[in-house]
């Protein structure tokens, strides 16, 4: 169990907190992270693509030309997949790309992503995310940490902080419930509040899976 500093927004130490080893010191396996990211992205896909089969194309009730004497192959319908404007054989149809991934694997992936940031020194614990709701103020805070893009995680959503962060496209703010592997890997760093640490540990607990 590692003890890390709790910082204010001037990057000054204001306390300390212990990080559970089974969540923030998990050995990283790329194949697990890859699987979890695939699962997330698959669930986001709309899957509304569709091509018309022979039975859905309009027209084609009449034989397009006589059986013999044309020098070409015989055809019984202009809707045939062999005809220009005809149907498509085995084309994409509406479907869901989502698949089931065990909770244990999802929780393990989240622990690995957090452990990776912790190992790289890109995980920061702050005392609070209370804000005046001004983007300029928040931008100044983030510059003190030298961050160009990061996820900002709070135990509960602060409306003013949320409003200020929406004008910063390279930063993403959400509560612990929204914490996910894809965003942790996409952004350079993570800033989480001291109060959210316990909730994160609870989310990543393999005993609950």
Swiss-Prot record:
Residue numbers spanned by region Disordered: 50-89
A GO cellular-component term linked to this record: ribonucleoprotein complex
GO molecular function: rRNA binding; structural constituent of ribosome
Keyword rRNA-binding: yes
Pfam families per the UniProt record, alphabetical: Ribosomal_L4
GO biological process terms, semicolon-separated: translation
Keywords of the record: Ribonucleoprotein, Ribosomal protein, RNA-binding, rRNA-binding
rRNA-binding keyword on record: yes
NCBIfam families: rplD_bact
Family: Belongs to the universal ribosomal protein uL4 family.
HAMAP family registered for this protein in UniProt: Ribosomal_uL4_B (MF_01328_B)
Subunit structure: Part of the 50S ribosomal subunit.
Role of this protein: One of the primary rRNA binding proteins, this protein initially binds near the 5'-end of the 23S rRNA. It is important during the early stages of 50S assembly. It makes multiple contacts with different domains of the 23S rRNA in the assembled 50S subunit and ribosome.
Name assigned to this protein: Large ribosomal subunit protein uL4
Species in which this protein is naturally found: Bdellovibrio bacteriovorus (strain ATCC 15356 / DSM 50701 / NCIMB 9529 / HD100)
């Amino acid at each position: 169990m590692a003890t890390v500093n709790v910082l204010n927004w001037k990057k000054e130490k204001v306390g300390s907190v212990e990080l559970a080893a089974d969540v923030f010191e998990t050995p990283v396996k790329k194949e697990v992270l890859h699987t979890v990211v695939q699962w997330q992205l698959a669930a986001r896909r709309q899957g509304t693509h569709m091509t018309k089969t022979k039975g859905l194309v309009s027209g084609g009730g009449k034989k397009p030309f006589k059986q013999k004497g044309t020098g070409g192959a015989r055809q019984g319908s202009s809707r045939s997949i062999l005809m220009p404007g005809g149907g498509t054989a085995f084309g994409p149809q509406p479907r869901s790309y989502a698949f089931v991934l065990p909770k244990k694997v999802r929780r393990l992936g989240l622990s690995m992503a957090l452990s990776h940031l912790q190992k790289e020194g890109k995980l920061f614990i702050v005392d609070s995310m209370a804000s005046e709701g001004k983007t300029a103020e928040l931008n100044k805070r983030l510059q003190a940490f030298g961050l160009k893009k990061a996820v900002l995680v709070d135990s509960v959503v602060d409306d003013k902080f949320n409003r200020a962060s929406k004008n910063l496209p390279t930063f993403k703010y959400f509560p612990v419930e929204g914490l996910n592997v894809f965003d942790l890997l996409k952004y350079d760093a993570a800033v989480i509040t001291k109060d959210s640490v316990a909730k994160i540990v609870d989310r990543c607990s393999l005993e609950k899976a």
